[in-house]
């Protein structure tokens, strides 16, 4: 898949997720097979650009090309200025968020709430595309609710405004993440456009990725929640799409080493105590399908230092590898 001058391969992309797709996670997913990793949503209001959170979100030093930064907001010129600011700070792709269903975003008329105002969508897209000399992409949902499934209309507006690629989540804003994603609307959008279309929603296995590509004709798939605690899914999907072969599940030793490396990267990136706190949700995701995961989470979530968090994690997985019960009560 081509987005401007950038060839995106393999055709499996990490979705932007607030509080998840930070620099350590993006680097990990790219290393394990993602063809593109989109940053967390950054707010377009310049009053917040100097906050600790925003500075972390805007840190892309050392990331492989292309660097894709997602922006969110409601005011066309403010979004245009945010796009310029991020390009000046290293962004090579600008992604506009019109897909987030969160109430705190939609109540401010950002994210997927923008899909209710097609004229405003056109003004935002035009302003951002004209503001920067890098490709601009867009993420949307299939519509606002089941009675207003206007994704195809928004998609045509996007193409007409110069958007370089479009990602579509197969739910309406009203669904949030309930029910199941549907792909017929994505197929309809793909059939009507000349720009690349990326399918998103409920893609949680290599087989599902292949199925969605067949059903939609999309140029790539985008994976979000299924990568939480499972960043190797990108390599699994890429391998299956290339060969038709399902890779065996990763070994416990591989999971352990991947997680320990991820923890160390979080500790280094955020410092103490923030790194330990942010790592806790990732620990829960990595452990959730393993024996005594609830007990492990209860113990490791009480760790207050990087060394303690790493030691408890290493001991837990070492016990699983050895086939013995983890000594969680002793660790507590």
Swiss-Prot record:
Keyword annotations of the record: Flavoprotein, FMN, NADP, Oxidoreductase, RNA-binding, tRNA processing, tRNA-binding
Keyword NADP part of the UniProt annotation: yes
InterPro entries: Aldolase_TIM (IPR013785), DUS-like_FMN-bd (IPR035587), DUS_fam (IPR001269), DusB (IPR032887), DusB-like (IPR004652), tRNA-dHydroUridine_Synthase_C (IPR024036), tRNA_hU_synthase_CS (IPR018517)
Classification via SUPFAM superfamilies: FMN-linked oxidoreductases (SSF51395)
Catalysis: reaction(s): a 5,6-dihydrouridine in tRNA + NAD(+) = a uridine in tRNA + NADH + H(+); a 5,6-dihydrouridine in tRNA + NADP(+) = a uridine in tRNA + NADPH + H(+)
Cofactor(s) of this protein: FMN
Binding site for FMN: 16-18, 70, 139, 200-202, 224-225
Keyword Flavoprotein: yes
EC code: 1.3.1.-
Gene3D superfamilies the UniProt entry points to: Aldolase class I, Putative flavin oxidoreducatase, domain 2
Any single Pfam family the record assigns to this protein: Dus
Family, as annotated: Belongs to the Dus family. DusB subfamily.
NCBIfam families, per database record: nifR3_yhdG
Protein name as it appears in the record: tRNA-dihydrouridine synthase B
Source organism: Xanthomonas axonopodis pv. citri (strain 306)
Gene label: dusB
